[in-house]
Curated annotation (Swiss-Prot):
This is Phosphoenolpyruvate carboxylase. Forms oxaloacetate, a four-carbon dicarboxylic acid source for the tricarboxylic acid cycle. It comes from Klebsiella pneumoniae (strain 342). It holds the Pfam family PEPcase. It is an enzyme of class 4 (lyase). The lineage of its organism: Bacteria, Pseudomonadati, Pseudomonadota, Gammaproteobacteria, Enterobacterales. InterPro entries: PEP_COase (IPR021135), PEP_COase_bac/pln-type (IPR022805), PEP_COase_Lys_AS (IPR018129), PEPCASE_His_AS (IPR033129), Pyrv/PenolPyrv_kinase-like_dom (IPR015813). Disulfide bonds: none annotated. The active site is at 138, 546.
Length: 883
């Protein structure tokens, strides 16, 4: 740990020095001196020097408008470099043990040591592994793609500099390259000027596949195979690839009017084009590698007389021609041209798999396994993991849009207004129509624009090549009719296959009713017959936490999953739980291993399907090596959860959780919904209103343009509180509820829960993480600078609550300080605080200046506005998340 941390500190210090030299070259010694003075004051302030803290505040308040931007940029860029160094150290040879591929070896050894598990059971669990990662655009990566590319290269330089045997000349060249990259970053505008379109977001997702996952996935499988061979004497079958990728970019239209049927159609084509492009590069490599002559009779027959000389090459060249023709056809479609379909148009994975696998089998049979298991095996595994679509797309739409569309249809048909019918009448109508062989609507019907959009989306799904759409997710699902409605709309569009339709239960009430809704659906004969023994249900983390607070939401999520698992098991249905976790803790984020092991027993039997959100994609999959670590962590957690499931919670533990949930929810809603001062306080103490100016994602920040906190999306809600360091949504109500249970004489039970129940210990661990990032003096400074004195009492009350909460959690965990069991993370937060604190102070100052100008009816100073955006990006980097 110490060796790793000192290596990280020395790299961070070296990068900081290079950044300092860059600033001096660009802006002169004076600005660098100013930045260095602020850094030293911040360090001393963190060490508890009150006089230096006051001097830090005064220095930042007195910066001229010309100094604001360089100072903000200096600290923001430093944090990006620190994050890059930290990402590198998590995968370096002396990196954090928990994130190395070794984690699989440790898990396999642990499983082998269990007296009740034999090797066959472990092999079966490996073969049933299923991991589907769903990439989403929001909260949206705040860092520009151009800067991400530079940081990837910085990472590569750090890796090479770590080599102890490097020659002086090479060391000099690498340092020169580092200086160039950091100078390029400094002279690049870190805030993008325009909001990305849904197509831009999709391209960002494809870039992650190309730059990291394309190499990372086969390398992870190679690593997994080696560990299985070493520990179980077992090799993965060639066609076994447990990892798949899906995307919401270009498919998620919930609250985003910019994602239309045409956009989805375009993104589907673009995704296929990118896949073709990447497979073309692979095949080109194989053409140069597979020059062998000896082959099996089967392969010779496939190659024919023309390919007799170099059969493998011949087949690869044939595949290359097919890929090029497919790419040209897709390019024409993307430009709006209609070309006749080429005879060899690639639309199915089998068309890629068959020639590649034929070559693989032949090489193995002819004693050339060493060649077969090289680039060729990697390409075969990419066919299984990415295939023709590259990433599949989920369609997501809000339930009310379907209800409104059906209402318009029934009114047109003169059979009443579907929207006003009872749930029983809706179900009766839907089941009747689903069983009917005739279409519901005449072809000449002209719907409204909103309804046409819903119907056109269903048409896009029906026309898409099979396998390119993964699921239809219904947000804000509340009733069985919400699910049946989508099935009817898809039937009307002429869909020729059974697409998984997943209700998303995301408020406290909906989570509590989820099992009833699914039980009713499974009791409908048509439904049971149609789903063919498989059901996907999505659990919403971010909206439930925003609705009820983290403690009540996490217990509702646990109970909903637990009940659904038991209901589906009883009904003989294979359940896939789809976890809509955010990156931040207030939106359900948690370290993967801990989060998975804290779920109810049996929750991963149907595999893991989970959203990977915005900025977390870069942290977890930004480099091939990091991808291997992240996938290894998921793999070990799924194996452990399925073979060593966590205990069923005791009845008294459930009772305590029910009490914690009830007390925390009342307190959370008491502030957020019922306190008349809360919304004005939130609006003034955080940069919530200013966040709208950041050109982040393609999706509006609010579901409805007007409205208070309840209409605000979970992401800006969390983002705003993260910026002012109160982190309120991630803890409000939780500590006070724990305190009440302690006062009721149940501290020893809470300690036992913390010790013996992964669900509860993970919950407390997440609270500790939030408390470590929260900061009382900074939150108070925002109040003093930005909030009217008549609202100060509310801020004081909230900060007192936070301080008391920290003490109660430490008492239950029997620790003297936060993050005692994760010193690596505690050190990392402390290191970044020195650079984040000045950005927070500066942000409060900039918000003050910006709002003063607005109140005086003046146009805001562009230097102030730009510096404000930079502080927002910088604090997000310091906190390691946006929303």
């Amino acid at each position: 740990m110490n060796e790793q941390y000192s290596a990280l500190r020395s790299n961070v210090s070296m990068l900081g020095k290079v950044l300092g030299d860059t600033i001096k070259d660009a802006l002169g010694e004076n600005i660098l001196d100013r930045v260095e003075t602020i850094r030293k004051l911040s360090k001393s302030s963190r060490a508890g020097n009150e006089a230096n803290r006051q001097e830090l505040l005064t220095t930042l308040q007195n910066l001229s408008n010309d100094e604001l931007l360089p100072v903000a940029r200096a600290f923001s860029q430093f944090l990006n470099l620190a994050n890059t160094a930290e990402q590198y150290h998590s995968i370096s040879p002396n990196g954090e043990a928990a994130s190395n591929p070794e984690v699989i070896a440790r898990t396999l050894r642990k499983l082998k040591d269990q007296p009740n598990l034999n090797e066959d059971t472990i092999k079966k669990a490996v073969e049933s592994l299923s991991l589907e990662l769903v990439l989403t655009a929001h909260p949206t990566e705040i860092t520009r793609r151009t800067l991400i590319h530079k940081m990837v290269e910085v990472n590569s330089c750090l890796k090479q500099l770590d080599n102890k045997d490097i020659a002086d000349y090479e060391h000099h060249q690498l340092m020169r390259r580092l200086r160039q990259l950091i100078a390029q970053s400094w002279h690049t505008d870190e805030i993008r000027k325009y909001r990305p379109s849904p197509v831009d977001e999709a391209k960002w997702g494809f870039a992650v596949v190309e730059n990291s996952l394309w190499e990372g996935v086969p390398n992870y499988l190679r690593e997994l195979n080696e560990q299985l061979e070493a520990n179980l004497g077992y090799q993965l079958p060639v066609d076994f690839v447990p990892v798949r990728f899906t995307s919401w970019m270009g498919g998620d239209r919930d609250g985003n009017p910019n994602v239309t049927a045409d956009i989805t159609r375009h993104v589907l084509l673009l995704s296929r084009w990118k896949a073709t492009d990447l497979f073309l590069k692979d095949v080109q490599v194989l053409i140069s590698e597979l020059s062998m002559v000896e082959c099996t009779d089967e392969l010779r027959a496939l190659a024919g007389a023309e390919g007799a000389q170099e059969p493998y090459r011949y087949l690869m060249k044939k595949l290359r021609t097919q890929l090029m023709e497919t790419q040209a056809w897709l390019e024409a479609r993307l430009k709006g041209q209609k070309l006749p379909k080429p005879a060899g148009l690639i639309t199915q994975n089998e068309q890629l798999w068959e020639p590649l696998y034929a070559c693989y089998k032949s090489l193995q049979a002819c004693g050339m396994g060493i060649i077969a298991n090289g680039e060729l095996l990697d390409t075969l595994r990419r066919v299984k993991s990415f295939g023709v679509p590259l990433v599949r797309i989920d369609i997501r739409q809000e339930s009310t849009r379907h209800t409104e569309a059906l209402g318009e249809m029934t009114r047109y048909l003169g059979i009443g207004d579907y929207e006003s019918w009872s749930e029983a009448d809706k179900q009766a109508f839907l089941i009747r129509e689903l069983n009917s062989k005739r279409p519901l609507l005449p072809r000449q019907w002209e719907p409204s624009e909103e309804t046409r959009e819903v119907l056109d989306t269903c048409k896009v799904i029906a026309e898409a090549p099979r396998g390119s759409i993964a699921a239809y997710v219904i947000s804000m699902a509340k009733t069985p009719s919400d699910v049946l409605a989508v099935h009817l709309l898809l039937k009307e569009a002429g869909i020729g296959f059974a697409l998984p339709v997943a209700p998303l239960f995301e408020t406290l009430d909906d989570l509590n009713n989820a099992n009833d809704v699914m039980t009713q659906l499974l009791n409908i004969d048509w439904y049971r017959g149609f789903i063919q023994g498989k059901q996907m249900v999505m659990i919403g983390y971010s909206d439930s936490a925003k609705d009820a607070g983290v403690m009540a939401a996490s217990w509702a999520q646990y109970q909903a999953q637990d009940a659904l698992i038991k209901t589906c098991e009883k009904a003989g249905i294979e359940l896939t739980l789809f976890h809509g976790r955010g990156g931040s803790i207030g939106r359900g984020g948690a370290p993967a291993h801990a989060a998975l092991l804290s779920q109810p027993p049996g929750s991963l039997k149907g595999g893991l399907r989970v959203t990977e959100q915005g900025e977390m994609i870069r942290f977890k999959y930004g480099l091939p090596e990091v991808t291997i670590s992240s996938l290894s962590l998921y793999t070990s957690a799924i194996l452990e959860a399925n073979l060593l499931p966590p205990p069923e919670p005791k009845a008294e533990w459930r009772d305590i959780m029910a009490e914690l949930s009830d007390v925390s929810c009342k307190m959370y809603r008491g502030y957020v919904r019922e306190n008349k001062d809360f919304v004005p306080y939130f609006r003034s103490a955080t940069p919530e209103q200013e966040l709208g100016k950041l050109p982040l994602g393609s999706r509006p920040a609010k579901r409805r343009p007007t409205g208070g906190v309840e209409s605000l999306r979970a992401i800006p809600w969390i983002f705003a509180w993260t910026q002012n360091r109160l982190m309120l949504p991630a803890w409000l109500g939780a500590g006070a509820a724990l305190q009440k249970v302690v006062e009721g004489g149940k501290q020893s039970e809470l300690e036992a829960m913390c010790r013996d129940w992964p669900f509860f210990s993970t919950r407390l661990g997440m609270l500790e993480m939030v408390y470590s990032k929260a900061d009382l003096w900074l939150a108070e400074y925002y109040d003093q600078r930005l909030v009217k004195p008549e609202l100060w009492a509310l801020g004081t009350e909230l900060r007192k609550l936070l301080a008391a909460d920290i003490n109660v959690v430490l008492a239950i965990a029997n620790d003297s300080h936060l993050m005692a069991d994760l010193p690596w993370i505690a050190e990392s937060i402390q290191l970044r605080n020195i650079y984040t604190d000045p950005l927070n102070v500066l942000q409060a100052e900039l918000l003050h200046r910006s709002r003063q100008a607005e109140e005086a009816g003046k146009d805001p100073d562009p230097r102030v506005e730009q510096a404000l955006m930079v502080t927002i990006a910088g604090v997000a980097a310091g906190m390691r998340n946006t929303g």
